[in-house]
């Protein structure tokens, strides 16, 4: 009880503090009333000028704290003139809590939308953008349209971000002082912004301040399902199949060389020639053919370096990796970089991962990137621990403007569901006779339809509220408080819209809320109850339960059933027991605790990918924002060469074999014959590095000389393409690792620690692959001097999807490609033979 009393005392203390500041705001009412409309706009301009002169975000916040009373008083006056509504003191208190970066818990009907206008206005003065976030696009559209009138009167601009808007329209919406959007669309825009190739293609500004309406729904209920942008799969899958067919046709030594020591396999001139004919391409080494080369190399590796029943097994149509140390299969683990798919193609089983995740993020990680985050809802106190631990937000319960008159009756418990529903229908019929409006809350859509059929049989006209239809939803909710109205709704439907009582309804008891089942979360039950008794209206609520309800079955209703049977109670007789209600609440707390633990676990795993995502996105943004990436390219070339020297050259070896190192250098940096054994024979690793480095520099300068001013554009294109290719592969690999990692707990291992360690190793490997690919394409791409390198348009963003919502889905756009440069007849042949193209692979032309 000590902990609970501390929370209660803390809320009391906070409410007192908010009340004091709110009184200060209210005391300025007369000062604002004498200002003309023009003077109000000028006051905004003055605030903007003063706050925007401060560059430091923390100091800006301090300044906003200082002007809060004046700013809030100004908004109150604006609301009075525009809407003929003046925010109450409790609304001002809620607005102060939101500005602080906390959650204002305000009961239904207390005017959360108007409450949000004050902190939105105040924080928008900083000129960094404020995002007002709703659960669906309908609410975003309605609120932005209604509130724009007030903000524009005060001198601020408002934007609306919808899924249907074009890139330019989105950019314009985000450029406004205040932007209304759904959580889904914000997350997708963030991911898409980190997939562009040019700075001017971004739509968002840096994330500054967000106010989330129905914050518990977005940050708690939707926290576990990630936002995903995925690419099309057909092309990728068919390429694995084609590469597999091609690999089967090749002959060892003639078409490819295999080094058993390093397990490296690469095409010979003859092999490259065959590939060009098979895939109907002119030059295998053109930049645009990177995907083809990658698939061929992977297919070769699958056929030549990996053996069935040694490196992997095929069990029930699935390729399972064999642990080289234990000899056991590793379910859930997959080879990375497309190798697993290549093996699946080789073995003729279904090629997995038809859609490739190009980018993903959870709401937990997206919203934690804002400088300041706040929210409002009718129900958040039960989840306060989660808000505090994960988002560093406190929940402040704001007092109601008028005392709550709703009568929350105790639960009625029946033996069977039939008995329960019969009783619900009788209750509705009785209330309907008196004209009292009834709102029936159900947990599932099927239950809504079942009750709807029962009411139809009794001749009761009613509406069924479907959360999928937002426009119809508002209309139904608007009528739900009228005399004689009966509305059936799933518990989550209708959020964000108030039920206002019709004429004469107050006198007959107000809105009656009937819950047909307890939800596993107390919060959802509280939301349903909160539909009644808004702004001091009369009303009542009651839950009807049965021992067959899912929650009761899960948490032991057998004992209760035996007791009811002993008492000889039949299906039509309920028990009304505080003990049972307490047991139900205890079961709900257990479920909430389990769900919190699951979300916390997901966050711990996601933290690994979050850090990696941050590094990759920063790297991409640096490349995009930089005019010249030559320093980065230089560092990658040196790093790749240094790794090659370290791996292949051992100074302790008295009789070193330089062939693997020379093959490596030829494969990544130089043409065949450029590095001779006598140039490095007998030298130590440092000298060998310098010998090769001087040759690399010459090749680099030669490439630069060919395209001159366009080198920066060429390097940017190669860097971004290499990063994106390997990053999307890495996301897939990490996902596969995560799916199978829980099995480690059976072997007394710590799955999270293993995931962190292996994830770190995979990331390092990916970074090395990016560097090696970049080195190879910068030095080995055949550049035609007289043809411009085109700016590469942004890659296809694929399909945006969020498991629990339809808002964010976007149709895949056609993918633009960069034209490859043809090989000049006198240029060195790209196959690495050292011959001129016309005397080698150019003979056929």
UniProtKB/Swiss-Prot annotation:
Its main location: membrane. SMART domains: SecA_DEAD, SecA_PP_bind. Keywords: ATP-binding, Cell membrane, Cytoplasm, Membrane, Metal-binding, Nucleotide-binding, Protein transport, Translocase, Translocation, Transport, Zinc. Its EC number is 7.4.2.8. GO terms for cellular component: cell envelope Sec protein transport complex; cytosol; plasma membrane. Residues 835-845 have a biased composition (Basic residues). GO terms for biological process: intracellular protein transmembrane transport; protein import; protein targeting; protein transport by the Sec complex. Monomer and homodimer. Part of the essential Sec protein translocation apparatus which comprises SecA, SecYEG and auxiliary proteins SecDF. Other proteins may also be involved. This is Protein translocase subunit SecA 1. It comes from Staphylococcus haemolyticus (strain JCSC1435). The gene is secA1.
């Amino acid at each position: 009880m000590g902990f609970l009393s501390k929370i209660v005392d803390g809320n009391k203390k906070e409410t007192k503090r908010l009340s004091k500041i709110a009184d200060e705001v209210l005391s300025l009412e007369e000062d604002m009333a004498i200002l003309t409309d023009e003077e109000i706009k000028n006051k905004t301009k003055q605030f903007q000028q003063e706050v925007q002169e401060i560059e430091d975000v923390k100091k800006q916040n301090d300044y906003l704290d200082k002007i809060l009373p004046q700013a809030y008083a100004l908004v109150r006056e604006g609301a009075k003139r525009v809407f003929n509504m003046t925010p109450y003191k409790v609304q001002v208190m809620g607005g102060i809590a939101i500005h602080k970066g906390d959650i204002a818990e305000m009961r239904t009907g207390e005017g959360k939308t108007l409450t949000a206008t004050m902190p939105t206005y105040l924080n928008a003065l900083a000129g960094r953008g404020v995002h007002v976030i709703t659960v669906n696009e309908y609410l975003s559209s309605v609120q932005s349209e209604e509130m724009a009138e007030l903000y524009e009167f005060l001198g601020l601009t408002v934007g609306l971000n919808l899924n249907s808007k074009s890139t330019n329209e989105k950019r314009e919406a985000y450029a406004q002082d205040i932007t209304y959007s759904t959580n889904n669309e914000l997350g997708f825009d963030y991911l898409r912004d980190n997939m562009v190739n040019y700075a001017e293609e971004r739509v968002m500004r840096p994330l500054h301040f967000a106010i989330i309406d129905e914050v518990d729904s977005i940050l708690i209920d939707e926290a576990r399902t990630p936002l995903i942008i995925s690419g099309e799969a057909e092309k990728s899958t068919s390429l694995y199949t084609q590469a597999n067919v091609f690999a089967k046709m090749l002959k060892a030594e003639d078409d490819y060389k295999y080094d058993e020591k390093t397990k490296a396999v690469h095409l010979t001139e003859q092999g490259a020639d065959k590939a060009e004919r098979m895939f109907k391409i002119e030059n295998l080494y053109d930049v645009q053919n990177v995907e083809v080369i990658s698939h061929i190399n992977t297919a070769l590796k699958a056929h030549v370096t990996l053996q069935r029943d040694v490196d992997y097994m095929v069990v029930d149509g699935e390729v399972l990796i064999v642990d080289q140390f234990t000899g056991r299969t590793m379910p859930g683990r997959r080879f990375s970089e497309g190798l697993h798919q290549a093996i699946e193609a080789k073995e003729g089983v279904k090629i997995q991962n038809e859609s490739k995740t190009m980018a993903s993020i959870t709401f937990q990680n997206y919203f934690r990137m804002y400088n300041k985050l706040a929210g409002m809802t009718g129900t958040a106190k039960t989840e306060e621990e989660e808000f505090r631990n994960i988002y560093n937000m406190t929940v402040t319960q704001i007092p109601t403007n008028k005392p709550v008159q709703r009568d929350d009756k105790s639960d009625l418990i029946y033996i069977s569901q039939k008995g329960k529903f019969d009783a619900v229908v009788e209750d509705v019929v009785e209330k309907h006779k008196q004209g009292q409006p009834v709102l029936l809350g159900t947990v599932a859509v099927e239950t809504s339809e079942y009750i709807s059929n029962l009411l139809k049989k009794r001749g009761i006209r009613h509406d069924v509220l479907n959360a999928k239809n937002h426009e119809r939803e508002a209309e139904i909710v608007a009528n739900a408080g009228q005399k004689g109205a009966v509305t059936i709704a799933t518990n989550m439907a209708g959020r964000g819209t108030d039920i206002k009582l019709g004429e004469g309804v107050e006198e007959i008891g107000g809105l009656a809320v009937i819950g047909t089942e307890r939800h596993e979360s107390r919060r959802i039950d509280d939301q349903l109850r909160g539909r009644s008794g808004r702004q001091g209206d009369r009303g009542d609520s009651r839950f009807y339960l049965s021992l067959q309800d899912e929650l009761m079955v899960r948490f032991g209703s057998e004992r209760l059933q035996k007791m009811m049977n002993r008492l000889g109670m039949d299906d039509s007789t309920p028990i009304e027991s505080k003990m049972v209600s307490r047991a139900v609440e205890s079961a709900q707390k257990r479920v909430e605790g389990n769900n919190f633990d699951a979300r916390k676990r997901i966050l711990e795993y996601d933290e690994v990918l979050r850090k990696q995502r941050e590094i990759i996105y920063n790297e991409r943004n640096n490349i995009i924002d930089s005019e010249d990436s030559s320093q980065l390219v230089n560092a990658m070339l040196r790093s790749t060469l240094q790794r090659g020297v370290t791996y292949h050259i051992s100074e302790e070896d008295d009789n070193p074999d330089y062939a693997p190192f020379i093959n490596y250098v030829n494969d990544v940096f130089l043409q065949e014959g450029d590095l001779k054994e006598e140039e490095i024979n007998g030298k130590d690793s440092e000298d060998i590095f310098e010998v090769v480095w001087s040759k690399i520099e010459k090749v680099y300068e030669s490439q630069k000389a060919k395209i001159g001013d366009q080198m920066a554009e060429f390097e940017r294109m190669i860097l971004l393409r290499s990063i994106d290719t390997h990053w999307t592969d890495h996301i897939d690999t990490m996902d596969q690792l995560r799916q199978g990692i829980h099995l480690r707990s059976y072997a007394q291992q710590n799955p999270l620690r293993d995931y962190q360690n292996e994830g770190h190793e995979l990331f390092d490997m990916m970074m090395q692959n990016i560097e090696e690919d970049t080195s190879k394409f910068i030095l080995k791409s055949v550049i035609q001097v007289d043809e411009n390198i085109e700016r590469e348009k942004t890659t296809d963003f694929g399909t945006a999807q969020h498991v629990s919502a339809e808002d964010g889905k976007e149709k895949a756009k056609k993918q633009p490609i960069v034209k490859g440069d043809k090989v000049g007849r006198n240029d060195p042949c790209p196959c690495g033979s050292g011959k001129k193209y016309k005397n080698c692979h150019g003979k056929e032309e």
